């Protein structure tokens, strides 16, 4: 995951 591209984190 990176910035806010994570679906859960």
From Swiss-Prot:
List of residues that carry Glycine amide: 9
Key words, A-Z: Amidation, Disulfide bond, Hormone, Secreted
Functional note: Has a role in the neurosecretory system of the vena cava.
Statement: the UniProt record of this protein carries the keyword Disulfide bond: yes
Domain of life: Eukaryota
Subcellular locations according to the entry: Secreted
Taxonomic classification: Eukaryota, Metazoa, Spiralia, Lophotrochozoa, Mollusca
Disulphide bridges: 1-6
Sections of the chain in a coiled coil: none
Family label: Belongs to the vasopressin/oxytocin family.
Broad class of the protein's primary localization: secreted
Keyword Thylakoid appears in the UniProt entry: no
Record's protein name: Cephalotocin
Organism of derivation: Octopus vulgaris (Common octopus)
UniProt GO cellular component terms: extracellular region
């Amino acid at each position: 995951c990176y910035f806010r591209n994570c679906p859960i984190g």
